[in-house]
A protein has these predicted regions:
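Core nucleotide-handling region used for phosphoryl-transfer chemistry
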Residues: 1-239
Length: 239
């Protein structure tokens, strides 16, 4: 296994408003989608992409395992499963640190979204299998049926779904007000080769979502779990 292989960059839909100057866009997405039998749409969560494999826990760079403070908990979890991973690489969204969205309904802080084995990205069913095997949750699957749609209908369905709040009560960290989900990630439900990644996975990101990486890292705060918010609300009621 090549320890240096990080997660591929996910190309944006051409109608994704949250692109930045260095983002990549799949202008031929519709042709790619016509070749995919079944799509899965999941909520894009606002966290750090972490990979767990037999060598350690990695953030975006796979040059060396991460030792950041906000990965301490997932690194402790890795210690328990590292000998069972073999060629399996688990990719998930680490929500231990709050970024641009404060989630108020989290039951845990790591959500699996992909599994790689050698030169293949495993199917969504296999992702769910390994999530259950290692006691992780998966990123939320969205109730979005886009089969047999025209391109215009498909585009509208993605845009409208992305306006929803999402599954974990997202709030803007600056205003404290409820906000929409960060975006949507679409993938082929079946397994596919690693080299085909740009043609099998697509994303839609809300406008003006991206904040400076330095901001959340320097002033990072631990994300609170749902039970902590419930306790806080209970204290307010008692007063």
């Amino acid at each position: 296994m090549d320890m240096q292989r990080k997660y591929g960059r996910t190309y944006h839909y051409p109608f994704s408003p949250g692109t930045t100057s260095d983002d990549r866009i799949n202008k031929e997405y519709w042709q790619d989608i016509q070749l995919i039998k079944r799509l899965i749409h999941t909520e894009k969560l606002d966290g750090e992409n972490n990979c767990l494999n037999q060598y350690g826990v990695f953030a975006r760079s796979h040059a060396t395992p991460t030792v950041s403070a906000w990965t301490r908990q997932i690194r402790q979890c890795w210690q328990q499963i590292k000998n069972d991973l073999g060629d399996i690489e688990l990719f998930g969204e680490n929500l231990y640190a709050t970024h641009s969205i404060e989630y108020r309904a989290l039951e845990q802080d790591f959500y699996l979204f992909a599994v790689r084995c050698k030169d293949m990205w495993l199917s969504w069913e296999e992702v769910k299998f390994y999530a259950a095997l290692f006691d992780f949750a998966c990123v939320p699957e969205l109730p979005l049926n886009t089969q047999n749609q025209t391109e215009a209908e498909y585009r509208l369905a993605i845009i409208e779904q992305a306006k929803e709040m999402g599954c974990f009560a997202p709030h803007d960290v600056h205003t404290g007000l409820p906000c929409s989900m960060e975006g949507i990630v679409t993938r082929n439900a079946a397994e596919f080769p690693v080299v085909q990644f740009p043609h099998q996975v697509f994303k839609y990101v809300r406008k003006n979502h991206v904040k400076t990486d330095r901001h959340w890292r320097v002033n990072w705060q631990r994300a609170r779990m749902a039970h902590e918010y419930r306790q806080e609300e209970g204290h307010v009621v008692l007063k």
